[in-house]
Structure formats: C-alpha cells, structure tokens
Swiss-Prot record:
InterPro entries in alphabetical order: A-macroglobulin_rcpt-bd, A-macroglobulin_rcpt-bd_sf, A2M/Complement_sys, A2M_N_BRD, Alpha-macroglob_thiol-ester_cl, Alpha-macroglobulin_TED, Anaphylatoxin/fibulin, Anaphylatoxin_comp_syst
Protein's job: Precursor of non-enzymatic components of the classical, alternative, lectin and GZMK complement pathways, which consist in a cascade of proteins that leads to phagocytosis and breakdown of pathogens and signaling that strengthens the adaptive immune system.
Domain spans labelled Anaphylatoxin-like: 683-718
Isoglutamyl cysteine thioester (Cys-Gln) crosslink location in chain: C999-Q1002
GO terms under biological process: complement activation, alternative pathway; complement activation, classical pathway; inflammatory response
Region described as C3d-like domain: 991-1269
Subunit architecture: In absence of complement activation, the C3 precursor is first processed by the removal of 4 Arg residues, forming two chains, beta and alpha, linked by a disulfide bond.
Keywords: Complement alternate pathway, Complement pathway, Disulfide bond, Immunity, Inflammatory response, Innate immunity, Secreted, Signal, Thioester bond
Full protein name: Complement C3
Length: 1651
C-alpha cells in the first residue's frame, strides 16, 4: 500500500497532458478487474473529432515492469469518438500467493491522449454451484452431488473445482478435486456422524477465496405419508382488535388424496426464548376431506394473559398434531412468528438513493411489511412535509415521487401508512434524511436518470428518462448523454443518447435481454466544457428467470397421468442446444421434512449478484461518487479521479428486494445523516462497512488515526449497524416435525412385493444434442421405470448451457398410486429383543367395498405370530374410499438390517399388493462414547524431534456381548488456535442478561450472569454477535443488581440473605469477587464498597493459621457450586483467596494487610494441597495458589484430572465444568500452555452456555476461564507435521501431512478393533488426536440412581362417564410421589412429565391443584408437541424432606397408539440441576407381550405351539425309533426332573440326565443338571412333575450354547414322554411301555440309528 500511495502522489504531480484544443478524454473501467476474464473498458473523447489510434496497455503495479496485456484500437467519428476495447489480465503472470491486495495499471496512450488508472484485481474467475440430491440424510447414507461452473459471461467452464464437506462444527472431513463435466462419486456419510447442518463447499482450485456452499441436514428420521399446512387468517395478532384468530389446517397425502382424521391444536405465546402455552386453547378438531379450522378466542387468550398489552412485541404460535383416521400416522406442524402488535405494519426505505438533486424529482421507494417481514400489499402510504401518496403493490413496495425544492442541502422524509381502519397513533411511521448531490465546483448542473417501471422482465422495452437542470450556458453544451450498463460486475454495454437543444427531458427505450438478469446498473453522464462531468445512476432489478430455456414435461399425454408403481414412462427435456441437464427425482416427503436447501434459480442469481461491484441503490454524493458507488473507476485528462478501491466486495451491496437489505440500507442512511460534519459522517459510514477479516468494532477502531472524535463516531455507527444486522438474521419460525414412522409402501400376496423405496433417484446427466427446432430449442426423450413408492415424485432438472448459463427448470411432478395398496409403517430403528408394534395400513380408493386377506411373511430374524410352520393371516372387509390399519407385533432377535414383508390380496379380484422393507435392528444396552484426547507436539514432547506413543485400548468390561466396537481416530491441526471464537458463540449468551431480584443471595445469583456475560463478550470482542445494544442493557442490569445488593450490605460491609441474619463469609467474598469484576466495566461501582468487604473478611473471618471460617452458611446452598462438598475448609479458603486476588488491583492501596492475608491463606493451602482428595478442590486450590504466584508445578493438578483434560466427579456435570474451569485458569497462570489445548477442547465440547439457578458458579467460571484463555494464550506457531498411525491388523500405517493450509481438515480413520495402536509425529507445531470409541454398554443396575430425591410413579385405570371423558377413549390416573433427601425441605422444585404418546393431561385437574386455597403446586405448563411427546411442567414451591409430597391427575387417551413407549417423570431442583431423579411409567401391557426366551443377550422366539407331553396310546417302538432318528434330532436322553424355577416369564426345568441314549452336541450331558427352558404358557400343557423320569429328545436348533454350558429349549419339536419308575414298570399298565423304552435304549445305544 505504501507503493500505491507513492504512485498516486507522483501521478498527481506529473499530471496528464490534455488536448491542445480543449478536449476532454475519459477512461472508465470496472472498479475491480477479474483475472483471466475479458473485461470491457471505455475510452471516450469529448470535443475532439480527430481520428486516432490508441494503444491499450495493462501493466503490473507499482513498477510497471511487465506488460500483462496490449492492444490497439482506432477511435473515429464513425464510432462517435469512443471505443470499448476488451482487456484481459492473465493470472499466471501475477503473485497469487500474496496476502495483500494486488493492482494493475490500465494505460491508454495516443495523440493528445495519456490516461492511466490503477485498478484492484480479483482472482474470482467464475461461479461454481453445488447441487445435492436432497437436503436431509441419515447416518451412513451417500450424498450425491454435482457441480456447475460458469464464467462471468455465464459460459460453461470445466475448470477443476475443490469440493469440501464440513461437519456442523466446521471441521473439514473430505476435500477432493472434481471435474464438473465428469462423473463424481458420492460422499458417504459415516455411521458415526455429527447431527446438524453440514456444508458442501465448492471453490476453484486456483482461486479458493471465492466459494459456494450447499447445505444439508444429517439426522435420524423417517419420511411422513402426508403433509400438513397451516394458514393463519392474519400474519399478525392486532392487540386492539376484538376478532378471534383463525388458522386453516390442510392435510394431504403425498400422492394427492385428502386426509381424514383429527387435529389436536394448542396455541401459545413465545416470550423471548420461552414458550408459554395456553392450556384452555387445547382443542380437538376433526379433519374432514383434508381440511379443518382452529380458533383462538380473545377470552381464551385473556385466561392465560390478563393484560394483553404486555404481549406486544412477542409472538403467537400454534402447534397442530394431525392423526389419521386409522391412528397409524401422525404429523406435527408448528407455525410461529405471528407477531402481537399495536400497529400491523412496518415501513422500510429500499432501492432509494441516499442523495437527491435539489429542484428535481426524488424517487422514494417505500417497502411495507407485515410484522413477520412478508410484503404487505394494498396498503395506502403517504409522505409528509413534501406530500405524496401511493398504495403498495403485491410485493409490498410503493413508489412515491417527491418534488424537491431548490437550495436545500438535506431532505427530511417521513412516511406513514394511511390505513382507514387504524387510528393515526397506530399507523406505522418511518423517517430518513437524504443529502443533496454536490455539483462539481458548485456549478448547479444536475442529471437525474429515472426508470419508472416496477417489475421488469426480459423482452420488455424499458423507457429511460434523462432529466437535466442547470444554467442555460451549460445546458446548451449538452449534445449527448453517454451511458454504461453494468451487469454482474462487468461493463455490458456502452452507448450514447443524443440530446437536442432545449430538451430538459430526453427518453430512450432500452430493450431488456436475458443477459441483464438478475439486475443491472444504468450509469449516465454528460460533460460541460473540458473539465466538468455530471452523472447519475440507477440500479434496476430484473425478474429472476433463466437466460436460456429448460422445460421438463411428459413425453406424451399418457406420461402426464397418475402412474402405477414400477411402470415405464418417459419425460421430454426441451432446452438450449448443447446444454448438459442434470436430473434427480425426489420423494416429496423429503421436502416435507426439509425444503430449505433445494437449488433454485433465485439462489443462483442471488450468488451471481454478489459479483456486482456497485455499493448503493444508485446516485452518489457527487459526480465521482456516482461512478464509485456503481462499481466503476474513472480518470480524465483533467485529473478527475475516482477514489481507489481497496476491497473487491462492497461493504453493503444493494441486494434485491429483501428485508435484510432494506433494513440495512435504510438504517445506514438515517444513522450517517445524524452527523452534520462531513468528516465525522465519513467516519460513521466507514464504521458501518462490513470488515472482510471479521474484526470487532473495537479492534477496527485501533487502526483509526484521525482522532478521538472520529473514533467515537466510528464505534457508535459500527455497533449500531451490527445490532441491526443481528436482528435481520432472525430465522423463520415455521417448521415441520415428523412422524415417528417411515413413509414408504410395501407389498402383497403372490405378486412380487414392492421393495425399492429410494428417497431420491434418477440421478442422470443428459446432453441436448438433438437438432434445434425453428425456435432454437433442442429436445430429448428420457425413458425410465418408476420406483415402487406410492407418492409424488418431484423431478428437478438443472441445465448448464454452453453460452446461457445455468437454468433450473420448474419441477415436474409424477404422482404414483393405485386403488388398492399397503402402506407399511416402520420406525427408523428398533432395539434387539425389545417388542415393537408395526402397522400396515391398507387403502381402498375404489368405489366398491372389498374383502382382503393380509399376511405377515415369516422371517427367523423376528419373533412374531408368523412362524416357520404356520402363516399368520387376517381377513376382513374394507369399505370403499377408506383405509384400515393392521397391527403386527414383533420382537427383533438379530441386529442388522432385516426384511419385514406384508402381502395382501382382494378376494375375487386380481388386485393385490406386497411391501418388503428393511428394518434396522440396533443392539441392546446404552450407547456409550469414550473420548480420549492426545496432544501431538513433537518439538516439546518428542525425543529427537519425534513423538512416539502407544495408545492403550479402552477396557470395555460392560460391553454387550457379540456387539461391535467402533473406534474413530481423528487428527486436527492446531485445534485451539481459534477455538473460542469459533465454538462459544456470543449470540447464545442472550439468556444471561436478566434483571436481578430477590434477597441478598438471590440478587447475586441473578446479577452474576450479566456480569460474566459482559466480562466474556468484552474479552472476546463478540458483542456484535449478541447485538451491541445489549451491552448497554447488560450494564444497566449490573447497576440494578449493584443498587439492590446495597440494601443487604451491613454497616461493617458484610452481607447476608437478609440484614437480620448472621453475615456469611462465602457470600461476602462472592460479592467482593463479582463487584471487583464489574468495576472493570462499570466505573460507578464504589471501591470503598469492594474494599470494605475485603477488610471484613480479613479481620473477622480469617484465623491465625490463614484459614477462613464460615459461621453462617448461605440459605441457597446451590449457589456455592462445588465448594459445597467435602474438604470445606480448603475449598472455602481457596475460594476467598480468589476473591481477594480479584480485588487486589482495587484495594491494595487501601488495605495494607491484604498481601499478608493472602500469604497466610496460601501458606495454609500449600500445606493441604498435595493431600486433597477431590479433583474439584485440587483445581480450585491450584488456581488460588497459581494466581497468588505460589505455584508453578502442575503435576499434582494433572494427576487429579481424568484424561488430562477434565476434573471430574461422578454425576456432577456443573461441578465438573466449574472445577475444570478453575484448572484451566491455574494452567494459564502457571503458563503451562502445552497442557491447555485438551482442557479448552473439553470445555468447548460441553456446549455449556450457563444459566442462573443451580448453575451460578459453573457459569461464572467457564466464561472467566475461556475469556482468560483468549487473552493469555500465545499465538500458534507455523504448522508442519508428519503423523503416522499404525492400526492393528493393517500392514501399512495411515500417514498424514498437516500444514497451515490444511490444518482445519480432519484426517479420520476407523477400525472395528478395540486394540492398542501406535502413533508417531514429527515436525513443527501441534495437532490434536481425538480417539472416539463407541460401543453398547450393558445397563448398570444403578443407572437410575437418584440424587437427593426419592420418586415413585404409578398409573391406574379410571372409569369415566361421557362428560368426564372429554372426547377421549380412556383415561389413567397418574400418581407422582416425591420426597427431598436433604436435611431440610427443598425449595423451588420442578417436575417434568413426558406424556405417553396419544395421551393428554387433564387441564382441569391441574388447575384444581394450583388454584385452590390448598395449592399443591405453584403453576404448571402444558406443551402438547406430539412429535416429541407432550410434556407437563409442574413448579413446586417446596418438597418436604420428612414426608412424601404426592400429586394425582388424570391423563386422557385421545387416540390409539400401537406400541406405547414409556413416559417419564423427572424431579429436579430449580437451583441445582445435579439434584434430580427420573422414573418411568407405562400402562399395564403384560398380556400383550410376545413370548421369547433369553439367555444373556441372546433371545429365541417362543411364539409357537407348546410341546405336548406325548400320551398317545398308539405309539410303538418303531415310531419312536423313526422319530428319534430323524435327521435334525440331536440327542435322546432319559432324565429326572429335579426342580423348577421361574425367570423372566419363562419356566426353567432342571433335569438330571440319567442315561444318554443318543449322544449329540452336549459332550458332558451327565456332568451336571441341565436346564430346559419353556414358556410359562406351556406349563399346564407340559404338566411336568418333580422327581419324575422322562424320555426326551430335541433338535440341534433347540440347543443353546452358554459360556461354559448348554441349555435346551422346549419347543413344539421337543419330544417328551413320562418314563415310569421301577415300581410302576411292575404294573401291567406300564409293562409294555417300559419294555419299549428299554428296547429303544438298547437299540440306539448298541446299534445306533438305522441308516
């Protein structure tokens, strides 16, 4: 930049030779030149008619040693004495690696002409876009994508593109080069994947600074079968009105048919971030023929909120749960963002120049919105002062023409709505101030370009008006207007419009071509004499359409009809010749889940429009400002020069009609106008420019050298516009939740079952190579077979023409269905050995009733009513135009993907259907993650520059047998360099800035969050993320808390909850600490107050040995954090030391004994330090000692850690965060930076944003520690690491090279083996290796151990009459009893109840519990979000510690659910979240359980016929030998029944094997008693008696190997006969039977089975 400045000075000194006869020569170029791109420039001669040749050069800057481009052009009268040569800057000649801006010199020389202009360069050589096949994926699925690349002329390019995939945490997990014209392999998501929004980022290989991002979500989901749409009667709730609020409900199946069912509707109000439901609004609404309507009555709203005016500024929401008539499927939709307002409109100024020409018309574009930001149509508006009226169009805009007076320098403008139904005080109003255009040298010459048309589209002829005003002499010199049209950052066209003498208005017609999409700038100027230029410009929006053509339609009328699954059909593509067309067909159910990320023409134009280098909506401060703001660089032969551009991107481009741009344009103009001084206004405007480095306002202000006044104006405007931007980032509140069951359709009887149900398919690329027709359009027919889904497919085509850019066609829909079909509903996954109910819904869309037979096909992977030997069938009628749900109960026995198949046929007809789908079965147990973080730092931790280590495998003693272990090893370079800024988002701290209230303790609890949030945001410079105006509010809250705390300050400067209580050492120290921190932010906090508390602590609570004592514990023990536990003396002393140290900078001069007090206390702590037991106390003490400069050895501290990254105690999350924060502070104070990285990473990974009650200390410490880290941590070194990972059973190690350029890309390797592996690292810098081990752990017996609460939950059936039932089908009474297990009653306590699916709480019961004089509960809230189950939250003022507190209320079942998951009840302390207990409840479903037999984690289905004790009279010896010697029979025994036990619903018969008649798998059958397992239901049929002998044999498949033994299953294939004892064999009745048994034994024992 220094060279740049010298060059400009030299240029000004040398000057440029002008024409000898008074001509004016101009050179105009784009303000930014793109490399490797042809750019048009303009050279013009005014007042010179002599033909001449001009040489055009492009040189390097500043030395001009290289000629990068050269050409010659002829200028003559035939060309109106202007030329538009094309130049091109080759990137290969430049230093691309330079991090500084690069410029070139554009030079024009010729007779009497010498012009030069320095122009900024950009390496953006084109546009690149990514299309993914859909916008949402499940773990493990492939992400198909294609890349489209065009240059700035919208011509197709096949340059190599780098495509990266980034996790929601911003980690690059894949980066590879792709060729846009070639085949691209999909990116396969791993099974172990981060849920959330992922990014696919595309950028050119040689210009990575410009990128395009496609987004997609990753989560577990199933597709719905129908969608629900809500349409409120108004977009707002007008507070003064008396009308009820109506919401229309529309429900449609995805194949177009209307849904019959019922909707449950509840309204609520969202206040800040909290949803407050209106219990009385819960209504059951029938959905008839797909439609219903919900109503919120004003009285219902007042029943929840008595003063409706308090709701102004908040939003209404409505949650609707629609359940189909069969109860088989459910979709939840929520519509939010319905603003509660006093005025229903807001006004913005958009597409309005900031500058006006005095005495000329000023075109003011007003944009009126509803409160949700949507355009408000047909609203009258009026401007005051200069009167003008208009009415908004359908897009919310109205154009007002203001006739401005002469001789004014500023124009105050006020516009208000003029709606006839609103009183004046309720009308919306908006003001701005426009500034007068400054003429050159005060000449008073003006040009106003006016375009009055509103919606402009290709093919239009656009009238452009040139209005001039000036003195007569000047006007007589105007012979023509030169105009330039800029599009996509390039000069698209240059022309001249003649003017005749005396014309003050000249009009030309401009033909709009597709090349001018999406918008263009029209810049015009005229010259007066040889030195004055008068200019104006206007920005023009063009309707978003394709530049070319692309249409998708059915190849014939037959193809446009409703199709059958699997049918053949054809589509026809029509488009530009040579276009490559990418196709994809997507199930519309995917868009019900997520349609945010679909590629569209509008999104493409939005991206391309960013290449516009113009920065305003038109006009300019003066003639040069017109060119600058339009994105042009100008120089003239009379030294008229635009300012040098220093950034390619505009601080605020004039986006098209969008609310965010409206807000910013309007806000910037009005804010800057507040500064009358031109210099300060410039400082303000610069403050509102966006910083490309992302610096904070404060950091940017450090670079200002123009004085304090400029710096103050800069900061004020910078903070102001940041707050506006934050408001504009409000996300849409309309979202759709999904059913818990999948949406695709399955098969039937003897027909091949439908089994192909992709979410997207037809991923093809077709080229239009056919001969074009007379309209220049090529076509191609594409044949294909439809998939098996019954749905509507949306076929999306994106074409890339060689010359006309990208075109996204209107989607073509293909509806697939038939009159009779099955919809098989499967969950996303089920747990092995757990029963689940699935449903097949049979639809009959025929006009006649039918009779059907349905069958569940047997699969040995499931236990079901369908068995190998017996098919499970049901037969029933289905009425015309209706459906019927058929439930099937199954128990999955094997993990993995297994087929579920249902078939159905119609009696007497050929109609049938079959569906086969995969069901994912996951292992039992609790999915556990073990994370180990290892820092690789070979220069510090290595030997000879190499760090080698062996990573020991985790001990997984609790792993579920026969389940896989997945280990993922990720390596990331220098992970801590920017971790705070990237991971702790300041915008999420909004909830911490609250109003303090309550007693001396509660006030500190509620004041602390504002203090620590301000401390953290100040330290990290993140106020922009939260909104700069929030800092003022935070300071106000701090001062409120400070003032209130003074009420509880005693005369001796100590504190207690109330002044009549004894003073608390801990509370006084805490007040000292918080006020000391706050005093750095608020100067009004008295140092005397802080130091008074310090003095009281030292003189009244410190013992001679240095320890601090507590004589009066606080009431709110939860605010103590971890200090509340064991080792109280050490933790209290350490805590008070940290408070004294915090106050040292304030009180050291006032309190002479402060340092000696700290020394005494730290002497005591040093004696205790190595003997401490708790990790928390060790961390706290280490910080106190390190902060006092008494500790520099971290060995004891690190020994107390878990994994060297956290200080952890069981079941105490907030204490662990607090303790780890103390440890981080200690490490920072000791400057042990090598140990810091993993600790910071762990804290960040907790995603902990703090809270108030019960979280005070964790909140304070985590943000204090992270802020301190941001301040202290030295900048990271250059990175150049080579890492090798040798995994077991792999011969070749994984090798990675990590440097600064690729540090953020994660290198990941996975293995299924949980074994030791070795790692080697060498080089410079640091990297973090994260080992994530995921496995299924057996549930611990104490998994539900409760902390500080006892809880009992039960349900019982309730008989109700018709009135009491309230439309429900049944009811239960939920009984909850809890007791606090502390020494005193628990104060504020919350009971959070998760409802059973299909059940709603009885609001009247809850009201009775809360409204009576004997109030059992403080208040309750109901959230009937059926997607996540409804919830009831109950607030209790206290819970007794001496007796149970019980609550009973009814819950009503409103619809049937096939398999009800348990509900849960959680009780927890409002003040301490670690004190909690959770229990589950479920209606009794014992008789509905399928029978299965389990040993360990292996289960066998037992849902078959019982084995019957063989008592047939006609069984002879030969039959027994034949049966015993059958192929699959494994053994034949004589046994004695020793005992019978019952376990898990099964009978276990312990048999002693007396004789092995035929040996089998069990080689030691007689070693000990053998277990025979049978279902309980077979007990009576078997009728086995103790001490009786039995002949028994069974199949090999009925043997069950155990760890050191074998068990035997008794199934229908087991043969059992009673063997009479010796005495009975003497009886005539049993003699023949005993002889047969003896002969059977001898035959098989001696001779074996006959062959």
């Amino acid at each position: 930049m220094e060279g740049m400045a010298l060059y400009l000075v030299a240029a000004l000194l040398i000057g440029f030779p002008g024409s000898s006869h008074g001509a004016l020569y101009t050179l105009i170029t784009p303000a930014v030149l793109r490399t490797d791109t042809e750019e048009q420039i303009l050279v013009e001669a005014h007042g010179d008619s002599t033909p001449k040749s001009l040489d055009i050069f492009v040189h390097d800057f500043p030395r001009k040693q290289k000629t990068l481009f050269q050409s010659r052009v002829d200028m003559n009268q035939a060309g109106s004495m202007f030329v538009t040569p094309t130049i091109k800057v080759p990137a290969k000649e430049l230093n691309k690696d330079s991090k500084q801006n690069q410029y070139v010199v554009v030079k024009v020389t010729g007779p009497q002409v010498a012009l030069e202009k320095v122009v900024l360069l950009s390496y953006q050589s084109g546009f690149v876009f990514i299309q993914t096949d859909k916008g949402i994926y499940t773990p493990g699925s492939p992400v198909r994508y294609r890349v489209f690349s065009v240059d700035h002329n919208m011509h197709r390019m096949d340059k190599t593109v780098i495509v990266e995939f980034q996790t929601p945490e911003g980690i690059v997990v894949s980066s590879k080069p792709v060729n846009p014209s070639g085949s691209i392999r999909p990116y396969n998501l791993p099974e172990l994947v981060s849920f959330g929004t992922w990014k696919a980022v595309a950028k050119y290989e040689h210009s990575p600074e410009e990128s395009y991002t496609a987004y997609f979500d990753v989560r577990e989901y199933v597709l719905p079968s129908f969608e629900v749409r809500l349409q409120p009667s108004d977009k707002f709730l007008y507070i003064d009105g008396n009308k009820n609020f109506h919401v229309s409900i529309t429900a449609r199946y995805l194949y177009g048919k209307k849904v019959e069912g019922v909707a449950f509707v509840v309204f609520g109000v969202k206040i800040d971030d909290a949803k407050k439901s209106i219990p009385d609004s819960l209504t059951r609404i029938p959905i008839i023929d797909g439609d219903g309507e919900a109503t919120l009555k004003r009285d219902t709203l007042r029943s929840r909120f008595q003063d409706l005016n308090q709701l102004v500024g908040h939003t209404l929401y409505v949650s609707v749960t629609v359940i189909t008539e069969s109860g088989s499927d459910m979709v939840v939709t929520e519509q939010g963002g319905i603003h509660i307002v006093t005025s229903p409109y807001q006004i913005y100024f958009t597409k309005t120049p900031k500058y006006f020409k005095p005495g000329m018309p000023y075109e003011l574009t007003v944009y009126v919105t509803n409160p949700d930001g949507s355009p408000a149509a047909h609203v009258p508006v009026v401007s005051e002062a200069i009167h003008s009226e208009g009415t908004t169009l359908s897009d919310g805009t109205a154009k007002l023409i203001l006739n401005t007076p002469l001789n004014i320098q500023s124009l105050p403008i006020t516009v208000r709505t003029n709606h006839g139904d609103l009183p004046r005080e309720r009308q919306a109003i908006k003001s701005m101030t426009a500034t007068a255009y400054q003429t050159q040298g005060g000449s008073e010459n003006y040009l106003h370009v006016a375009i009055t048309s509103t919606e402009i589209k290709p093919g239009d002829n656009l009238p452009v008006n040139f209005n001039v005003r000036g003195n007569a002499n000047s006007l007589n010199q105007i012979k023509y207007f030169t105009y330039l049209i800029l599009n996509k950052g390039k000069i698209f066209k240059v022309g001249r419009q003649p003017r005749r003498d005396g014309q003050n208005l000249v009009t030309m017609n401009l033909h709009i071509t597709p090349d001018l999409i999406p918008s263009f700038r029209f810049v015009a100027y005229y010259q007066v004499g040889n030195n004055e230029i008068v200019a104006d410009s206007v920005w023009v929006d063009v309707k978003d359409t394709c530049m070319g053509t692309l249409v998708v339609k059915g190849a014939s009328s037959r193809d446009d009809r409703i199709q059958k699954p699997g049918a053949a059909m054809k589509i026809k593509l029509e488009g530009d010749p040579g276009a490559r067309v990418g196709l994809v067909a997507v199930d519309k159910a995917v868009y019900v889940l997520n349609d945010k990320y679909k590629i569209s023409q509008a999104k493409i134009w939005d991206t391309i429009e960013k290449s516009d280098f113009g920065c305003t909506a038109g006009s300019g401060q003066n003639n040069l400002g017109v060119f600058e703001d339009a994105g042009l660089a100008l120089t003239t032969s009379t030294n008229l020069n635009t300012k040098q551009r220093s950034a390619a991107k505009c601080p605020q481009p004039a986006n098209r009609r969008r609310r965010s741009s409206v807000l910013l344009l309007d806000s910037k103009a009005s804010k800057a106008a507040q500064f009358q001084d031109q210099g300060l206004r410039k400082c303000c405007e610069d403050g509102m420019h966006e910083n490309p480095m992302g610096y904070t306002c404060e950091k940017r202000a450090k670079y200002i050298q123009e004085g304090d006044a400029c710096k103050a104006a800069f900061l004020e405007c910078c903070h102001y516009i940041k707050g506006i931007r934050d408001e504009n980032q409000r996300e849409s509140e309309l979202f759709l939740a999904r059913s818990d069951f999948e949406d695709e359709l399955f098969g039937d009887d003897n027909i091949i079952s439908r089994s192909d149900f992709p979410e997207s398919w037809l991923w093809l690329t077709e080229e239009l190579t056919g001969e074009p027709n007379n309209q220049g359009i090529s076509s191609k027919t594409v044949p294909f077979y439809l998939r098996d889904s019954i749905t509507t497919w949306e076929l999306l085509a994106v074409g890339l023409s060689p010359t006309k850019g990208i075109c996204v066609a209107e989607p073509y829909e293909i509806t697939v269905m038939k009159d009779f079909f099955i919809d098989l509903r499967l969950p996303y996954s089920v747990v092995k050995n757990e029963q689940v109910e699935i449903r097949a819904i049979l639809y009959n869309y025929a006009d006649e009733d039918i009779y059907v037979r349905v069958e569940l096909i047997y699969n040995p992977a499931f236990c079901s009513a369908s068995t190998e030997g017996q098919r499970y069938r049901q037969q029933f009628p289905i009425k015309a135009l209706s459906s019927r749900a058929v439930p099937f109960v199954i128990v999955p026995l094997e993990q993995g993907l297994h087929d579920v198949e249902v078939i159905a046929s119609v009696r007497g007809e050929l109609a049938s259907d079959g569906v086969r789908k995969k069901l994912k079965v996951v292992p039992e147990g609790e999915r556990k993650n073990i994370v180990t973080i290892i820092e690789l730092d070979p220069s510090v931790k290595g030997v000879g520059g190499t760090q080698e280590l062996t990573v020991i495998a985790n001990k997984l003693d609790d792993k579920v047998p026969d389940t896989e272990v997945e280990t993922r090893i990720s390596v990331l370079g220098d992970p801590v360099a920017q971790i705070i800024e990237n991971s702790i988002d300041g915008s999420k701290l909004n909830h911490l800035i609250i109003t303090p209230s309550g007693c001396g303790e509660q006030n500190m609890i509620t004041m602390t969050p504002s203090v620590i949030a301000t401390y953290y945001l100040d330290a990290t410079g993140q106020w922009e993320n939260l909104g700069v105006d929030r800092r003022t509010e935070a300071i106000k809250q701090i001062m409120t808390g400070y003032a209130q705390q003074m009420v509880y300050k005693k005369a001796d400067h100590s504190y207690a909850a109330f002044t009549n209580r004894a003073s608390s050492s801990w509370l006084t120290a805490y007040v000292v600490k918080v006020l000391a921190m706050a005093s750095n932010m608020v100067k009004d906090i008295s140092h005397e107050i802080i130091c008074g508390g310090v003095k009281w602590l030292i003189l009244n609570r410190q013992q001679p040995d240095g320890v601090f004592k507590e004589n009066a514990p606080v009431i709110h023990g939860e605010m103590l954090g971890g200090t509340k536990g064991a080792e109280p003396e050490a933790s209290l002393t350490a805590f008070i030391v940290t408070a004294l140290l915090e106050s040292r900078s304030v009180c050291k001069e006032q309190i002479n004994i402060l340092d000696s007090s700290i020394n005494k206390a730290t002497d005591y702590l040093l004696k205790k330090y190595e003997k401490l037991q708790r990790p928390y106390t060790t961390a706290l003490t280490a910080y106190a000692l390190a902060a006092a400069d008494r500790l520099n050895d971290d060995r004891v501290l690190m020994a107390a850690s878990t994994g060297r990254n956290r200080w952890e105690e069981y079941n105490a999350r907030t204490h662990n965060i607090e303790g780890t924060s103390y440890a981080l502070l200690a490490l920072l104070k000791m400057k042990k930076f090598a140990e810091v990285g993993p600790v910071v990473r762990w804290l960040i990974d907790q995603k902990y944003y703090g809270g108030t009650y019960g979280q005070t200390q964790a909140t304070v410490m985590v943000f204090q520690a992270l802020a301190e880290y941001e301040i202290q941590m030295p900048t990271h070194q250059d990175l150049n690491l080579d890492i090798s990972i040798k995994l077991p059973e792999r011969e070749v190690p994984e090798r990675y090279s990590i440097n600064d350029r690729n540090a953020v890309q994660a290198r990941t390797v996975e293995t299924k083996l949980n074994e030791d592996f070795t790692v080697s690292a060498s080089g410079d810098g640091k990297a973090t290796m994260t080992i994530l081990t995921v496995y299924n752990a057996q549930l611990r017996e104490d998994a539900n151990v409760c902390n500080k609460f006892h809880l009992d939950v039960s349900v019982e059936n309730v008989e109700l009459n018709l009135k009491q039932a309230k439309g429900g089908k049944a009811a239960l009474r939920l009984k909850i009893c809890t007791r606090y297990l502390g020494e005193v009653d628990s104060t504020m306590t919350i009971i959070d109840i998760s409802m059973l699916t299909g059940f709603f709480p009885d609001a009247e019961d809850l009201k009775r519990l809360s409204n009576g004089v004997d109030r059992y509960i403080s208040k309750f809230e109901i959230d009937n979000n059926m997607a996540q189950k409804g919830t009831v939250v109950i607030y209790l003022d206290k819970v007794s510690h001496s007796e149970d507190e019980c609550l009973h209320f009814k819950i009503h079942k409103h619809f049937e659910v096939g398999f009800i998951q348990p509900g849960s009840v959680k009780v927890y302390s409002y003040y301490n979240l670690d004190e909690q207990c959770t229990k589950f409840y479920h209606p009794d479903k014992e008789t509905g359980l399928l029978n299965k037999i389990c040993h360990g984690n292996i289960c066998r289905c037992a849902e078959e016929t019982c084995s019957l004790l063989n008592q047939q009279k006609k069984i002879d010896l030969q039959l027994r030998i034949q049966k015993a010697c059958a192929q699959n029979v494994d053994y034949v025994y004589k046994t004695k029944l020793l005992r019978i036990e019952e376990k898990d619903g099964n009978d276990i018969y312990f048999m002693d094997v007396l004789e092995v008649i035929k040996g089998g798998t069990d080689r030691n059958a007689q070693a000990k008693a053998r277990q025979y397992v049978s279902q309980r239901k077979c007990q009576e049929a078997l009728n086995l008696k103790l001490d009786n002998d039995y002949l028994i044999w069974g199949l090999s498949s009925d043997l069950w190997p155990m760890k050191d033994d074998i068990s035997y299953l008794i199934t229908k294939n087991t043969w059992i006969e009673r063997w009479p004892n010796e005495d009975e064999c003497q009886d005539e009745e049993f003699q023949n039977l005993c002889d047969d048994f003896a002969q059977l034994s001898n035959t098989l024992t001696i001779f074996g089975c006959p062959t």
